[in-house]
Amino acid sequence: MAPRGRKRKAEAAMVAAAEKQERLANSGEGMEETTVVIEHCTSURVYGXNAAALSQALRLEAPELPVKVNPTKPRRGSFEVTLLRPDGSSAELWTGIKKGPPRKLKFPEPQEVVEELKKYLS
């Protein structure tokens, strides 16, 4: 006999993912401008230090562009930079989720992200 519960767990995971997408869309609701979101893991201070350095570089390069750090609960081991547009679409500037070990591969050079941001804004 097949073990029970697998189907329900898979459905729950899909529902949770859909809810997360909806929350991200709703958090951007009423947003009238383009925003940069940095999601980083909170398990280690290295993630936070790199997120702060990246956020500072983005603010220096585009001062009119708001930068949000961890607007929702971050995923474990994540370091992502996303550009949220007013129309609800998003563009991934950097993802370090599948990178590493070593951990330093998860973090981009700030200049790389700034160049990627310029591509999407122009």
Curated annotation (Swiss-Prot):
- The covalent link annotated as Cysteinyl-selenocysteine (Cys-Sec) occurs at C41-U44
UniProt cross-references to InterPro entries, sorted A to Z = Selenoprotein_Rdx-typ, SelWTH-like, Thioredoxin-like_sf
Q: Which GO terms describe its cellular component?
A: Golgi apparatus
Task: Mark the residues carrying the PTM N6-acetyllysine.
Answer: K20
Q: Which UniProt keywords apply?
A: Acetylation, Redox-active center, Selenocysteine
Q: Function of this protein?
A: May be involved in a redox-related process.
What does the similarity note say? Belongs to the SelWTH family.
Protein name, entry field = Selenoprotein H
The source organism is: Macaca fascicularis
The encoding gene is SELENOH
